[in-house]
Amino acid sequence: MAIYDFIVKSENEKTSKALEKYQKFWTDDEDKYDGMTLKEFKKDGDPGDKVYQYPPLDVDVKLEAFLGEDGSTEIRAYIENGTEEIYVGTAAKTKAKKILKLLQEIDPRITGELYGGKYWKMENSGYVDDRWKEDLTVRVYLEW
């Protein structure tokens, strides 16, 4: 598996259907994804979850990274077709630029906006980010 392949796991039926046009993959049970082999993943995962390879992107994507309270950087990617939002996951702050570089190798149209600092470190503020509703979430795990 190339370092910039994606694993997409959708927990939402509508999003799963939207992703079905992409080619499903898993060729080698010895390959590990999220620390598990394919067999382990299928056994452990929700029966409704589906795993897909994300092809080279053919839509515009905006990438953002936010500094989390634990010092990690949350990477968010938006597919600019008005219907999909992708949550890419968390990564150490030092890896955020590396992830952006890998995404840009897939599709140079991906733009990066790296944010951090006090604004996004909402400690004890009661701030609720309602832009990320569960029914819009697609979880994407990057191998690096």
Locations of regions flagged by a protein language model:
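Conserved active-site motif detector
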Residues: 1-144
